[in-house]
A protein has these predicted regions:
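Catalytic-core regions of hydrolytic enzymes
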Residues: 2-34, 198-284
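A short beta-strand element within beta-rich, extracytoplasmic domains
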Residues: 100-124
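Residue-level detector of conserved catalytic or cofactor/ligand-binding positions
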Residues: 285-291
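Extracellular carbohydrate recognition and processing domains
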Residues: 137-166
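Short beta-strands within extracellular/lumenal beta-sheet-rich domains
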Residues: 82-108
Length: 292
């Protein structure tokens, strides 16, 4: 908790204002509510697909995200419980208004700021410029996401203000418009940090996810078991410490900065850790006058 009080309000905004794209293995959103919109789990929120004359949404052969339970036990991975969808890309043309898209419209329990995370699967012909639009109270913000890397986990887009309820100015849209010939992939979209849902010792913490350790956030983010549970569930304290570096290594595996390790190919250039366990002690040193 102590280090998060520095990292979230100060360190991450400072780095982002300097132009960095920041990833943190712990939850970064202090919003206690969490709404997930997904094709596999219909609820009060809305997931919608619209095809074009040339392209139709299809289920991939790769497993995707699905939240089929409220609480997850050790080793359970929500990113292997569902499906993901894909569609052929189309280049933008002035006269072509027949673009295909997917929409995620959440039903939010309260007005406030929510982090927006998207997910997808990296496919053999994924494109590097998947176009996402986030509709929020401040307008519309566009993102180009490289789906050639980072598939099968949560990808943070930003934190935005949304109104309570379900409306057409609070949603995420993925278009099949691209400058490349290939496919874009759609899976779940998450709004808000939420509460911890990883069971340890037969119960959950009852805390907001941002107050929990990286071990539990990484499991919710679809990391492989060995990334967050090197001690096989027998020592969460040690696992939590190791999860932070293990997650970064897995995300960057296969990239130009970490070519020797298998992973998601995200080119993470630098890692930084803030420690709060430094201390000091009083030491008395006796220096005697040399004998002549």
């Amino acid at each position: 908790m102590f280090t998060q009080s520095f990292i979230l309000p100060y360190v991450i905004p400072m780095l982002e204002n300097a132009g960095a794209i920041v990833y943190t293995p712990r939850e970064r959103d202090t919003q206690k509510n969490e709404i997930i919109v997904d094709n596999d789990t219909p609820n009060a929120s809305l997931y919608l697909e619209v095809g074009s004359k040339k392209a139709r949404w299809t289920t991939t052969s790769v497993k995707g995200f699905a939240q089929k339970k409220a609480i997850y036990k050790d080793g359970e991975n929500p990113f292997t419980d569902g499906t993901s969808r894909y569609i052929q890309t189309e280049k933008k043309k002035k006269k072509n208004k027949d673009q295909a898209f997917a929409e995620w419209v959440p039903t939010l329990p309260a007005t406030g700021k929510y982090a927006v995370y998207v997910s997808y699967q990296t496919l053999p012909n994924s494109v590097s410029d998947a176009k996402y639009l986030v509709f929020h109270n401040g307008g519309v913000t566009e993102f180009k996401v490289n789906q050639k890397i980072g598939g099968g986990t949560w990808v943070y887009l930003g934190t935005f203000e949304f109104d309570k309820g379900n409306n057409d100015y609070g949603m995420v849209v993925l278009s099949n418009e691209s400058s490349e010939h290939g496919v874009v992939c759609a899976d779940a979209v998450r709004f808000g940090g939420g509460m911890g849902n990883i069971s340890r010792g037969g119960k959950i913490s009852g805390l907001p996810r941002y107050l929990e350790g990286a071990r539990y956030s990484s499991q919710w983010a679809g990391m492989p078991y060995d990334v967050y549970a090197g001690r096989k569930g027998e020592n969460d304290y040690t696992d939590d410490i190791n999860t932070r570096s293990n997650t970064i290594n897995y995300l960057s595996g296969g990239s130009v900065y970490n070519p020797g390790q298998t992973g998601l190919g995200v080119p993470l250039e630098m890692t930084m850790a803030l420690h709060s366990d430094a201390g000091c002690s009083l030491s008395l040193i006796h220096i005697s006058e040399p004998t002549r």
